[in-house]
Design a protein with these regions (language model features):
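Conserved nucleotide-cofactor-binding alpha/beta core module
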Residues: 96-130
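A short alpha-helix capping/helix-coil boundary motif
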Residues: 4-5, 73, 94, 121
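Conserved short-loop catalytic and cofactor-binding motifs
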Residues: 13, 41, 78-81, 107, ...
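N-terminal auxiliary segments of SAM/dcSAM-dependent transferases
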Residues: 1-65
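Conserved alpha-helix/loop element of class I SAM-dependent methyltransferases that forms part
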Residues: 27, 31-37, 49, 70-74, ...
Length: 130
């Protein structure tokens, strides 16, 4: 379901497995941010970034065969030699962009559309092209 520029899943689409896996994924992203802080300079990600990751249903952007891995902290194939990026990388890229609600973002390489969906509630407009 698309609501206000953000792809969201209705409550019925969020299975118990998805919710539990998402909670684990968000913990893992926070741990990864902390453990890579000396390299990246980002020991934690903004609450706003983490909240968007919590709301955007990654399982909507992966194939039926990969539903069980939708909230694994790893890239997944989406066909045509492309992948949906690792969630930590999506969070990191979003964090370092340091966007706000006045920004217009042009994304080159839409892929699954997940990164654009993550950016959408944080900025004024996202334009994306494959």
């Amino acid at each position: 379901m698309k609501k206000g520029g953000l792809v969201t899943a209705s409550a019925s689409e969020w299975t118990t497995h998805h919710k539990e896996a998402l909670a684990g994924l968000l913990r893992e992203i926070a741990e990864d941010a902390h453990s890579t802080a000396k390299l990246t300079g980002y020991p934690v990600f903004d609450d706003e970034v983490m909240e968007v990751l919590r709301k955007v249903p990654r399982h909507v952007f992966v194939s039926d065969q990969d539903q069980g891995l939708a909230y694994a902290n790893r890239p997944l194939g989406i066909g045509h030699g492309q992948t949906i990026s690792q969630p930590y990388i999506v969070a990191f890229m979003t964090e370092i962009l340091d966007v706000n609600s006045t920004y217009k973002v042009l994304e080159i390489g839409t892929g699954s559309g997940y990164q654009a969906a993550v950016l959408s509630p944080l900025v004024k407009h996202v334009y994306t092209i494959e």
